[in-house]
């Protein structure tokens, strides 16, 4: 490295994306028992998520066909359709990639696929997170500013398009920073070891720290804050309305009135936020810990490490159950 960074700093930012392994010559990774369990659980969740999300898409399609041809899907069902597509994309890209990578341990697919799959992986993680933000914003506006939403029928389509666009743009740096490295075992037991990593792609160590923090913020912190704020506004608005007219509480027994629909919306958005928080918090806690202390890999047991990473794969499995229960 042609800079003034210390060796420790260089080591920190020349790390592998697959954070479950540590690449150091002479100590090359192997597929452990806990790794085999992780692979098994990963492919099991892959099957569950694929079945759940595909089933919901088919249910939406059948629901549409039963309606009159002149009617379109409601705005909420359009949003749920795009969230399902985003979850399905994450399922079909991230889970098989993680499972196969843990089986092979090293990277055999070459430089091009290293870059392309790294891009698709992050893109498929951005998309569902941003789509959850769109749903939260749309439901919040529908309750707090219903007239403004009705007067701007294209707002939902704009937010959906923006979510997909930002996902593709924010994942773009992956095409540049990821590449192949080749390591040799000091013991001479292996002829070579290839891995797809961000090895020394950043001029200085803090550049990677900034990129990691930006990615973490866009994938987790910002979406979570927006969902919490939107839910708080929905609760505040409904509480104020019911306080002004307590008799509306009795109307909630009917399935054909606005208060009941609003309460169902509140329950669904809260369930989304809860699932998002529960599933992704362990994953990012481990990731942040690794950013600030790469040696934590040697202190945290291998089973705990794999267990925390598996939490993230639960989210695309839970989402179709949530919106299937509350919307259809």
From Swiss-Prot:
GO terms for cellular component: plasma membrane. GO terms for molecular function: gonadotropin-releasing hormone receptor activity; peptide binding. The chain crosses the membrane at residues 39-58, 78-97, 116-137, 165-184, 213-232, 282-300, 307-326. It is a multi-pass membrane protein. Keywords: Cell membrane, Disulfide bond, G-protein coupled receptor, Glycoprotein, Membrane, Receptor, Transducer, Transmembrane, Transmembrane helix. Gene3D superfamilies: Rhodopsin 7-helix transmembrane proteins. This is Gonadotropin-releasing hormone receptor. It comes from Ovis aries. The lineage of its organism: Eukaryota, Metazoa, Chordata, Craniata, Vertebrata.
């Amino acid at each position: 490295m042609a800079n003034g960074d210390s060796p420790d700093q260089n080591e920190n930012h020349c790390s592998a994306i697959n954070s479950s392994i540590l690449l150091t010559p002479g100590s090359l990774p192997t597929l452990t028992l806990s790794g085999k369990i992780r692979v098994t659980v990963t492919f099991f969740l892959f099957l569950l998520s694929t079945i759940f999300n595909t089933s919901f898409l088919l249910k939406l399609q059948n629901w549409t066909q039963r309606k009159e041809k002149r009617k379109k899907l409601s705005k909420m069902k359009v949003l749920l359709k795009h969230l399902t597509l985003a979850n399905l994309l994450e399922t079909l890209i991230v889970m098989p990639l993680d499972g196969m990578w843990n089986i092979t341990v090293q990277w055999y697919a070459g430089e091009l696929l290293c870059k392309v799959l790294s891009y698709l992986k992050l893109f498929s993680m951005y998309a569902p997170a941003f789509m959850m933000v769109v749903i939260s914003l749309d439901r919040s506006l529908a309750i707090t500013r219903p007239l403004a939403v009705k007067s701007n029928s294209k707002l939902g389509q704009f937010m959906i398009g923006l979510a997909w666009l930002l996902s593709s743009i924010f994942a773009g740096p992956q095409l540049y920073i990821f590449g192949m490295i080749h390591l040799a075992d000091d013991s001479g037991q292996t002829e070579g070891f290839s891995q797809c990593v961000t090895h020394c792609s950043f001029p200085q160590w803090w550049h990677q720290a900034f990129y990691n923090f930006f990615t973490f913020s866009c994938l987790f912190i910002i979406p979570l804050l927006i969902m919490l704020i939107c839910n708080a506004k929905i609760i505040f608005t409904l509480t104020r309305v019911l306080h002004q007219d307590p008799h509306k509480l009795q109307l909630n027994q009917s399935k054909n009135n606005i208060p009941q629909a609003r309460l169902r919306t509140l329950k669904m958005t809260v369930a989304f936020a809860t699932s998002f928080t529960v599933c992704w918090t362990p994953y990012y806690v481990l990731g942040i810990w690794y950013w600030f202390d790469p040696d934590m890999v040697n202190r945290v047991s291998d089973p705990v490490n794999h267990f925390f990473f598996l939490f993230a794969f639960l989210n695309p499995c839970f989402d179709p159950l949530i919106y299937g229960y509350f919307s259809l």
